[in-house]
Every structure is written in C-alpha cells, then in structure tokens.
Amino acid sequence: MGRAYQNRKLSMAKTAGAKTKVYSKYGKEIYVAAKNGGFDPDGNLSLRHLIDGAKKDQVPTHVIERAIEKAKGGGGEDYERASYEGYGPGGCSVIVDCLTDNNKRTWTDVRNCFMKTGGNIGSPGTVAHMFEHQAVFVFKGEDDEAVLEELMMADVDVIDVEGEDGKITVFCPHTEFYKAKTALNEIYPNLELDIEEITFVPQIDHDIAPEHVDKFEKFMAMLEDCDDVQEVYHNAVLPDE
C-alpha cells in the first residue's frame, strides 16, 4: 500500500503542476480555516497544518498572509464543503472534495468530469465505505519495524508501517495526526517529512487497464481544472506503478 500510495500522490501532483492552482487551493483553504477557527495558528490546529503544508509546497508567504487578512476583514465569500463520489474511468473509486460558494455550479462541473470520461457520479456513500480516513506520513528510512516499535512506545495508535525503496510510510487513525507527528519529531530530530497529511486511503487498490489510462488522465486533468475542487481521492493504480 505504501508504494501505491506514494505513486498515487505523485500522479496527483503532476496534474496540479500549475502554481496558480496550488496557490488558489491553499488560499481558499487557509481563508476558510482562519474565518471559522481563528487567526492564530497556535490556537487553530487546522490553520497551522494548512500553513505548514503551504510552506512545504513553496506557496509564497504573501499568499498565506493575504488569505488570513481577508478572513480578518470579515465578509467575503461564504464557502461550504461539498463532497462527490462515483466511479471514474476504468471502474476506479473516486471521492472529490470541494469548497464552493455555488453548489449547483460545482455539481455540474464535477458531474461533467465523470460523464465526459466514461465515469459515473453517484449518491453520497457510493464509494466512501471503500476508503479509510487516516493520517499518513512518508519519510526516508529503511527499518519499518524499528519505526513501529518506537511509535508504539510513544503510545501512538498505528494502523500500519511500511518500508519500501528507502521510504517509510506510516498510517494512523486521522485523530492521531498531531500525536504521531510530535512523536516522530521527538524520536527522529530534524526529520524531514515528504508527506504529512490527513487523507482518505483506499482499502483496496484498483488496477487501471492500459486502454483506460488516457481517459483516467483526462479525468484527473479535468477535475484539476475545476476551481472548486480541492482534493481528489481514488484507488486507481496505473500500469507499471
């Protein structure tokens, strides 16, 4: 699962190549987090996590500060979260998370992505049961058993630890995110985390047949072009991954 997870993240990152899209995504998320939970990252863990992620993805400081200042000013857009589920090209399971100020527009845009690439959008719960809400950490390392032992000694609830190709992937319940991150930083000072996030991890991977690869990549690109789409979770594994 670790290798497939890392490859899945890389495939998503390729479609998210445009810097303006990355900046917009973080700007919107930071604005909503600050508006709903307070402007101080020390007292708003969601905001702190987003700021840390933005810095890791090289989002300029002025983009972060502008989003927080916008939230402080009050008014502005009233975004709400929307989630859509269905089956993408080749039969893979897909969850699309959005932030929107117009549900009808967003629903139409996301539905078109499914329909124009041979997929099917479903009702809530269609595929959500095929994913688990987890905290995931990826970093350089070889000894996954030692990492598991150290985390257990730190009283962290661990779902799995995998080691492959010089990378360690740690999976925990999403509620253990900050506890696990704190423990990892204490166990391994100066640790550089390649990935640190709360996400939806598929229970079972789904191999995409070669004849469906082009449509799958088009599907992902179309979703990435939707301004309201923030995250896309899927269980697709492309050939040679």
Swiss-Prot record:
UniProt source species: Psychromonas ingrahamii (strain DSM 17664 / CCUG 51855 / 37)
Record-stated family: Belongs to the TACO1 family.
Protein's cellular compartments: Cytoplasm
GO CC annotations on file: cytosol
GO function term, MF aspect, one: DNA binding
Gene3D superfamilies in the cross-refs: 1.10.10.200, 3.30.70.980
Disulfide bond entries: none
Lineage, broadest ranks: Bacteria, Pseudomonadati, Pseudomonadota, Gammaproteobacteria, Alteromonadales
Key word Transcription regulation present: yes
The protein's name: Probable transcriptional regulatory protein Ping_2063
Main location: cytoplasm
Keyword annotations from UniProtKB, A to Z: Cytoplasm, DNA-binding, Transcription, Transcription regulation
GO annotation (BP), single: regulation of DNA-templated transcription
Pfam short name (any one): Transcrip_reg
Domain of life of the native organism: Bacteria
